Curated annotation (Swiss-Prot):
Subcellular location(s) of the protein: Cell inner membrane
Any Pfam family matching the protein: ABC_tran
Residues annotated to bind ATP: G40, P41, N42, G43, C44, G45, K46, T47
Alphabetized UniProt keyword annotations: ATP-binding, Cell inner membrane, Cell membrane, Cytochrome c-type biogenesis, Membrane, Nucleotide-binding, Translocase, Transport
Protein name: Cytochrome c biogenesis ATP-binding export protein CcmA
Domain of life, per lineage: Bacteria
GO molecular function: ABC-type heme transporter activity; ATP binding; ATP hydrolysis activity
Length: 215
């Protein structure tokens, strides 16, 4: 049987930063249900790879296809643009969790998520009752959970996550592990970096040691 076309595919990818080649000749592909963990030593380009895959950086060489189309050549179809959550929460301090998630959800849905859907997402990450509190009053862990609440909103199938377990307590880590695995088990896809040892792995889990492609 000929395998289905990958939703995400990178071919002969290379990345240079500040005059140093981080990696080159990297091939990867992601199909429905896959979880790809990017590992490797500090400085090998893990975060840079994620930024390439979501279009925030351009590769030094190689090609990235998203949904069989060259990444960045034209806007992704509605609901197909990858959801990117970086190491920093990337929320606006002066806004409330409800307000932050309202505009962030609009990046992937024409009208964004409604207030009830956002409240349900905040409840899922343990922030019920904090919907209308300015984010600058929240702890680092709570701000991280505001960002991660995006994973509980309707959105695209592909998630790109940089150290998603940072600043979470044990209960938060266990809950997020479960949610990530279930996303893949229901046909979603994830590429992520993490120093956390995962205890729940979906059938499509793979590890990519980026150090093997260091220049």
């Amino acid at each position: 049987m000929i395998p289905a076309t990958p939703f995400l595919q990178a071919t002969a990818l290379a990345c240079e930063r500040d005059g140093r080649m981080l990696f080159e000749n990297l091939d990867l592909h992601l199909h429905t249900g896959d979880m790809l963990q990017i590992s490797g030593p500090n400085g090998c380009g893990k975060t840079s790879l994620l930024r390439l895959l979501c279009g925030l950086m351009q590769p030094t060489a190689g090609q990235i296809l998203l949904d069989a189309q060259p990444l960045g050549r034209q806007p992704a179809a509605p609901g197909r643009k990858p959801l990117w959550i970086g190491h920093a929460p990337a929320i606006k301090d002066v806004l409330t969790p409800l307000e932050n998630l309202s505009w962030l959800s609009a990046l992937h849905q024409p009208d964004g998520a409604d207030a009830d859907t956002i409240a349900t997402a905040l409840d899922a990450v343990g922030l019920a009752g904090f919907e209308d509190v300015p984010c600058h009053t929240l702890s680092a862990g709570q701000q991280r959970r505001v960002a991660l609440a995006r994973l509980y909103l309707p959105g695209p199938p592909l998630w790109l996550l940089d150290e998603p377990f940072t600043a979470l307590d044990r209960q938060g880590i266990e809950q997020l592990e479960k949610h990530l695995a279930e996303h893949c088990e229901h046909g979603g896809m994830i590429v992520m970096t993490t120093h956390h040892s995962l205890n729940r792995l979906p059938a499509g889990y793979r590890d990519l040691d980026l150090g093997q492609w260091s220049a």
